[in-house]
């Protein structure tokens, strides 16, 4: 547990390092901390913080820089997140970009772009998972013994299946079947629909039962699409010296973007948490590069979490600015998708 003096000096050191990108010495700490301490006293406190693993000394400088552990303590206990000065402008830009009524994939891709533009780092979005339940279905006659099954999920995703039936159906019969399913089974998984149809088979006409079973079978035979990660603004990170100054580190960074497996795992983990999460490289095993951090937040459709979005940038990022950008974007993306 740090005493107030050590906490103030650590907070000041991290804030100055984020702002300037240079190791912070005792003279700078004396100027910005607001504490009336001698350089010798400050050096003693810095030595204690170094022993605790919160700061380190680069070989080329007399100053110190925060470690991943120091950043974690900072964001967990010292960071004051306030609405940015341009909060209304940020919200307006997000709203203008995320137009309700647009196709879901386009809205989600726009969210990645707006995160990148506002943060000047990389924006990332885990696209909504395909729902295992349905909101509405419709049968459409195409020709003799060929029917188009249209499935609408709670997320607004529309899926089509082609059904080959043993007999022909009239449009009125198809309407009757879809009305029955929508009235009795909407909001359930197709596996649950299959189970209930077995229980109610005696109450239904044989032709309707055949059609419903064909619909359920077609819906469950098609495997779920894999989760997709959309990334925007990777090139912004080329301008970040912390990440681009070392070629091996830069190669590793773009391997993360190319393979996406690690990002998928990280975004999936954060989708099970409430609110904004901060993953710090070197401190989180989910972030493969020590100089990289990821700020994430889940987004919803009609109150149900369906994906995650975030910003990928250097560990030396202005967290107090990036956090509200991610939070605002997640909230407004949820609103746009829920209004579809």
UniProtKB/Swiss-Prot annotation:
PANTHER family xref list: HEAT-INDUCIBLE TRANSCRIPTION REPRESSOR HRCA
HAMAP family attached to this UniProt entry: HrcA
Keywords: Repressor, Stress response, Transcription, Transcription regulation
Pfam families found in the cross-reference section: HrcA (PF01628), HrcA_DNA-bdg (PF03444)
SUPFAM superfamilies according to UniProt: GAF domain-like (SSF55781), Winged helix' DNA-binding domain (SSF46785)
GO terms of molecular function: DNA binding
Function statement: Negative regulator of class I heat shock genes (grpE-dnaK-dnaJ and groELS operons). Prevents heat-shock induction of these operons.
UniProt gene name: hrcA
Organism lineage: Bacteria, Pseudomonadati, Pseudomonadota, Betaproteobacteria, Burkholderiales
Protein name: Heat-inducible transcription repressor HrcA
Record has DNA-binding as a keyword: no
Similarity comment: family membership: Belongs to the HrcA family.
Organism: Burkholderia vietnamiensis (strain G4 / LMG 22486)
BP terms from Gene Ontology: negative regulation of DNA-templated transcription
Keyword Transcription assigned: yes
């Amino acid at each position: 547990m740090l005493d107030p003096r050590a906490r103030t000096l650590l907070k000041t050191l991290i804030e100055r390092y984020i702002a300037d990108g240079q190791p912070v010495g005792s003279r700078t700490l004396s100027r910005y901390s607001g504490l009336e301490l001698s350089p010798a006293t400050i050096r003693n406190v810095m030595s204690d913080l170094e022993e605790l693993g919160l700061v380190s000394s680069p070989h080329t400088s007399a100053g110190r820089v925060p470690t991943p552990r120091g950043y974690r303590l900072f964001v967990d206990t010292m960071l004051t997140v306030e609405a940015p000065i341009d909060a209304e402008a940020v919200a307006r830009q997000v709203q203008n970009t995320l137009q309700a009524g647009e196709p879901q994939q386009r809205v989600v891709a726009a969210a990645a772009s707006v995160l990148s533009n506002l943060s000047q780092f990389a924006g990332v979005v885990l696209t909504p998972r395909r729902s295992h339940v349905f909101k509405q279905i419709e049968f459409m006659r195409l020709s003799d013994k060929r029917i188009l099954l249209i499935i609408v999920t709670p997320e607004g995703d529309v899926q089509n299946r082609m059904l080959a039936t043993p007999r022909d159906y009239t449009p009125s019969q198809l309407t009757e079947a879809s009305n029955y399913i929508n009235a009795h089974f909407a909001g359930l998984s197709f596996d649950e629909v299959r189970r209930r149809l077995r229980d109610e088979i005696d109450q239904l006409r044989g032709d309707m039962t055949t059609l419903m079973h064909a619909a359920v079978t077609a819906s469950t035979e098609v495997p779920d699409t894999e989760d997709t990660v959309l990334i925007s603004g990777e090139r912004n990170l080329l301008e970040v010296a912390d990440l681009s100054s070392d070629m091996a580190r830069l190669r590793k960074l773009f391997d993360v973007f190319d393979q996406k497996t690690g990002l998928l795992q990280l975004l999936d983990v954060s989708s099970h948490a409430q609110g904004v999460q901060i993953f710090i490289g070197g401190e989180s095993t989910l972030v493969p590069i020590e100089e990289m951090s990821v700020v994430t937040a889940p987004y919803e459709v009609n109150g149900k979490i369906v994906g995650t979005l975030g910003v990928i940038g250097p560990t030396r990022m202005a967290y107090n600015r990036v956090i509200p950008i991610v939070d605002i974007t997640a909230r407004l993306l949820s609103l746009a998708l829920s209004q579809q």
